[in-house]
Amino acid sequence: MTATVTAPRGAFGQIVRNEARLAWRQPAGLIAGVGISLGLLIMFGEVSAFRQSSARLDGLTTFEIYLPILIAFSIGAIALIYLPGPLVSYREQGILRRMSTTPAPASWVLAAQLVVQACAMVFSLLVLLIVSIVFFGASAPKNVGGLILAIVLSIAAMFTIGLTIAAMARTAGAARGILAAVFYPLMFFAGLYYPVQLMPGIMLGISHLTPLGASAQALVYSIYGGFPPVQSLLVLAGYSLIFGYLARRLFRWE
């Protein structure tokens, strides 16, 4: 009779710690997700004209408009720039295949990556909100429940898209190419380069149907007093379900 070999207690926690150390040593994705968004927030906050309300921006200031956009940017950058790379590299190097011969399943590496990067996202969001409130006089989020729901769905949508890219890309170089082709257009429709409120009708409609556009819209509503639009939540949930299914079907461990 063959004995079943189980992973030692605490093995998953050790994998999470290892992935966290690797993320700290190779912080490019974390810098993109945390550093760039924080730098842009400070830059916008230091421009006095950006703190004056505008009728063209639905009565909000430019700074207030960009806070939720930068939160969406942070989520997208970590999920799309940092998540696929290590997973594709592990597959290229045969690490995932070798783990299948150990008591710890290869899926634990994937789960550990998600834990580390979810923590990085939450840290980034807290930093952006705290800095905006403490140093630039932004009001605290009005609808905390709606904000949490919007953040959870945004993270789920972007994680599943990132995992699908990791599933499709055969090499780390191919993953970077796909990411560049996906991330920057998504950030355009989220309003990073041009405020969504000023987009013409067709582009505005497209924006609301993209994951980061829907995320930014849901965040705007929840931060400034309302519940996120149902359409935005459904769009994010739809991306999570569709790309979650694709990632599961397409992901290869070797």
Kindly label every feature range from the protein language model.
Residues 4-11, 15-93, 113-121, 125, ...:
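Transmembrane helix-boundary elements of multi-pass transport/secretion proteins
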Residues 42-50, 166-209:
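Transmembrane helix segments
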Residues 31-32, 107-111, 178:
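Signature of the 12-TM Major Facilitator Superfamily
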Residues 106-107, 140, 172:
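Alpha-helix N-cap/start motif
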Residues 98-107, 211:
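Short helix-to-coil transition segments within interhelical loops
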Residues 45-49, 89, 98, 133, ...:
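Transmembrane helix-loop junction
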Residues 2-18, 192-233:
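Short hydrophobic, aromatic-rich alpha-helical segments embedded in or entering the lipid bilayer
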